[in-house]
UniProtKB/Swiss-Prot annotation:
One GO MF term: structural constituent of ribosome
Family: Belongs to the universal ribosomal protein uS19 family.
GO biological process terms on file: ribosomal small subunit assembly; translation
Pfam families in UniProt: Ribosomal_S19
Biological role stated in the UniProt entry: Protein S19 forms a complex with S13 that binds strongly to the 16S ribosomal RNA.
RNA-binding listed as a keyword: yes
PANTHER family noted in UniProt: RIBOSOMAL PROTEIN S19P FAMILY MEMBER (PTHR11880), SMALL RIBOSOMAL SUBUNIT PROTEIN US19M (PTHR11880:SF8)
Entry's Gene Ontology cellular component terms: cytoplasm; small ribosomal subunit
Entry keyword set: Ribonucleoprotein, Ribosomal protein, RNA-binding, rRNA-binding
This protein's name: Small ribosomal subunit protein uS19
Keyword field contains rRNA-binding: yes
């Protein structure tokens, strides 16, 4: 289900202040954020945003195709290391 048009997009006010300052001054540094739930707006296009994945900030370059999506969609929070090999399982027994 999508968010109501009446409510508008979900945006973090602190993140939007940082984005406005960065776009006005043409900063190319990474904007760190923990707000994975924030929606990407057209104002963010061309900026580098560091989205927190629970351990570190993953740098993401925002493009036009990302507008309307959430920041958290572009970083994974879980690392799959693979299942145990058959050799290791037989040694444990």
């Amino acid at each position: 289900m999508s968010r109501s048009v009446k409510k508008g997009p979900a945006l973090c006010p602190k993140l939007m202040k940082k984005v406005e300052v960065a776009s006005a001054t043409n900063q190319k540094s990474i904007i760190k954020t923990w707000a994975r739930w924030s929606t990407i707006t057209p104002l963010m296009v061309g900026l580098n945003v560091g989205v927190h994945d629970g351990r570190r900030h993953v740098p993401i370059y925002i493009t036009e195709n990302m507008v309307g999506h959430k920041l958290g969609e572009f970083t994974t929070t879980r690392n799959f290391r693979g299942h145990a090999k058959a050799e290791k399982v037989s040694q444990v027994k």
